[in-house]
UniProtKB/Swiss-Prot annotation:
<feature type="binding site">
    <location>
        <begin position="71"/>
        <end position="72"/>
    </location>
    <ligand>
        <name>NAD(+)</name>
    </ligand>
</feature>
<dbReference type="Pfam" id="PF13561">
    <property type="entry name" value="adh_short_C2"/>
</dbReference>
<keyword id="KW-0560">Oxidoreductase</keyword>
<protein>
    <recommendedName>
        <fullName>Probable galactose dehydrogenase GalD</fullName>
        <ecNumber>1.1.1.-</ecNumber>
    </recommendedName>
</protein>
<keyword id="KW-0520">NAD</keyword>
<dbReference type="InterPro" id="IPR002347">
    <property type="entry name" value="SDR_fam"/>
</dbReference>
<feature type="binding site">
    <location>
        <begin position="20"/>
        <end position="23"/>
    </location>
    <ligand>
        <name>NAD(+)</name>
    </ligand>
</feature>
<dbReference type="InterPro" id="IPR036291">
    <property type="entry name" value="NAD(P)-bd_dom_sf"/>
</dbReference>
<dbReference type="GO" id="GO:0016491">
    <property type="term" value="F:oxidoreductase activity"/>
</dbReference>
<feature type="binding site">
    <location>
        <begin position="163"/>
        <end position="167"/>
    </location>
    <ligand>
        <name>NAD(+)</name>
    </ligand>
</feature>
<comment type="similarity">
    <text>Belongs to the short-chain dehydrogenases/reductases (SDR) family.</text>
</comment>
<dbReference type="InterPro" id="IPR020904">
    <property type="entry name" value="Sc_DH/Rdtase_CS"/>
</dbReference>
<feature type="binding site">
    <location>
        <position position="150"/>
    </location>
    <ligand>
        <name>substrate</name>
    </ligand>
</feature>
<feature type="active site" description="Proton acceptor">
    <location>
        <position position="163"/>
    </location>
</feature>
<feature type="binding site">
    <location>
        <position position="196"/>
    </location>
    <ligand>
        <name>NAD(+)</name>
    </ligand>
</feature>
<comment type="function">
    <text>Involved in the degradation of galactose via the DeLey-Doudoroff pathway. Catalyzes the oxidation of galactose in the presence of NAD(+). Uses NAD(+) as a hydrogen acceptor more efficiently than NADP(+).</text>
</comment>
<feature type="binding site">
    <location>
        <position position="98"/>
    </location>
    <ligand>
        <name>NAD(+)</name>
    </ligand>
</feature>
Length: 256
């Protein structure tokens, strides 16, 4: 599948910060915003794939995104990444909180350490990144925050209790922040992807059989990929959704 061709003129020259942008869904979003003419920075812990993405996007658009290497489990690193993005881009009007890791772990195997690790990777940094970026958006007169959740917490999946908890928590966080930041013209929405097939998912978890089972549950009988999330994210980031906040948009091919 190729990236959607729709253009959102208001995104041109807009400062955009994407977390977890070095691969998978995040990389598709970084590329898409760059194609819209936005000024893009992204955070990732993995340097090799991130630098390769910068080269690819620069070759395609003539402008390389700014890569910030950081471990988002560290709150000070989150704050430093936000400050670096603002300094590099001049402003951040769009924040996409995408970084996550869906490790599998049985109920009996969960420890205090693994529980805290999952919430740190999948929930905590979203709040602190919003906290760091919001003052910049307030000074600019507004902005859009897009938080990536998942339909996983709606599926009764037995092997991801901590991950499901984090992804459910993102919905509560989104609604709370929308209420707090709305008076400052900052919109906060969430996207809940379904089974998005990425290279990492294929390598670690998915089989042809599991993909087929999920497609059977979907109304749309095809495999969903990262590019399927580009259009919805661009829409929420742009002024086309100017009256939309505190909402959770499910992109799952019709499971729900």
């Amino acid at each position: 599948m190729t990236l959607p061709s729709s253009q959102f003129p208001d995104l041109r020259d807009r400062g955009v910060l994407v977390t977890g942008g070095g691969s998978g869904i995040g990389a598709a979003l970084v590329e898409a915003f760059a194609r819209q003419g936005a000024r893009v920075a992204f955070v990732d812990i993995a340097a090799e794939s991130s630098l390769a993405l910068c080269e690819k996007v620069a070759a395609q658009t003539g402008q390389a995104p700014h890569f910030i290497q950081a471990d988002l489990r560290n709150v000070e690193a989150v704050r430093a990444a936000a400050d670096e993005a603002v300094a590099k881009l001049g402003s951040v009007r769009v924040l996409v909180n995408n970084a996550a890791r869906d490790d599998r772990q049985a109920l009996e195997a969960v420890t205090e350490e693994s529980w805290d690790e999952s919430l740190s990777v999948n929930l905590r940094h979203l709040f602190f990144m919003c906290q760091a970026v919001a003052p910049h958006m307030q000074r600019q007169g507004g902005g859009s925050i897009v938080n990536f959740s998942s339909i996983a917490f709606l599926l009764n999946m037995p092997e991801i209790p901590a991950y499901s908890t984090a992804k459910a928590g993102i919905i509560g966080l989104t609604k709370s922040l929308a209420g707090k930041l709305g008076p400052d013209n900052i919109r906060v929405n969430a996207i809940l992807p379904g089974m998005i097939v990425t290279e990492r998912q294929r390598r670690l978890w998915l089989t042809e059989e599991s993909i087929a089972r999920m497609q059977e549950r979907q109304c749309l009988k095809r495999m969903l990929v990262a590019d399927d999330l580009v259009g919805p994210c661009l829409f929420l980031a742009s002024d086309s959704s100017a009256a939309m906040t505190a909402q959770a948009m499910i992109i799952d091919g019709g499971v729900f």
